[in-house]
Amino acid sequence: MKFWTMLCAIIVSTMLMQHPANAGDTVGVRQLSAASTERGIDLDVTVWYPAQPGGETVSLGDSNLFVGTSAMRDAPITDAKFPLILLSHGAGLAGNPQAMSWIATPLARQGFVVAAPTHPGNTGKNRSAAETMKLWLRPADLTATLTAVEKEAFFRDHLEQGKVGALGLSMGGNTALAIAGARVDPKLLAAYCDTDLLNASLCEWVRQSGVDLHAMDLQPAGRDNRDGRIRFAMAIDPAPTDIFDVKSFAGISIPVDIVNLGRPGKIPATADASGIAKAMSKASYATVEDASHYSMFAECKPGAPGIIASEQIGDPVCDDGEGRSRSEIHAQLIDMAAAAFTRALKTDP
């Protein structure tokens, strides 16, 4: 299975389709900037939140392949306090916050503020294999986002103090584990693309971009990226999982939920997190057996399979497992995430 499909050239850029808001909308969405001292730039951050009627309805993540999810841009926030979930996206087609709207929007509807930075280099016109492979900078993006949201006047009086969690999908799952305390092994990262056996799609892009992981400065890759403000982490089909220093898992002190997509024994090694879950003292592990890695993408539009065939796209981005639709799999993942973050952030210890 290929993990990150680098097909951005054929994908219509994310569109925000404006319509008058209606009283039935309950989720707001807002953009802000987060200063990143690590990267020397400001990060674009998308925030979903429980909202009152108002603003304009927008469709986030809509493209010629994928169905968008509606929210109300700049709607007034509901007058209450909410836990905060930091959301980390993957790379390629899932390489932006809007691609995660299918899970962010219902979590906001469940009473969470969800904030997702755009990790630089992962997709779009500024796509960069070198930046994408600097996995150790991604947790710092979440840390910068947390600081920015806590300081933002629009949100700061609506956040429950000390109630912060991290959620990541695919490469974002790697990020969620890292901010919980997992450390990258620089030697394993350097050797990750020595073969195509681990991640053919990603590593082909890395090589075509002229990036030699052995030649990169990976000295900072093994640092501790944990943020003590994070109380809980959830990783859905995290990848790569096989570049971590296994000894670091024992030092993770917060609860961690890990979900793999696929049947045990059929999950590719780079995403199989069953072993690392056993190495953590407070981890729980589950699988969604009739799903695939591509199930974390938004629902495909009816014409998407034809586009995939005509463009000779090698990755079956619209294929799931067996028996259920993507919408049904999404409903299960949303329920799992909502239950996990409610337990971790809405229940007093």
Q: PLM features: what roles do these ranges have?
A:
Residues T147-E150, G173-D185:
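Short glycine-enriched nucleophile-adjacent loop
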Residues F244, G265-D272:
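Conserved alpha/beta-hydrolase "acid-adjacent" motif
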Residues P302-P349:
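Catalytic active-site module of serine/aspartate enzymes centered on a nucleophile-bearing elbow/loop
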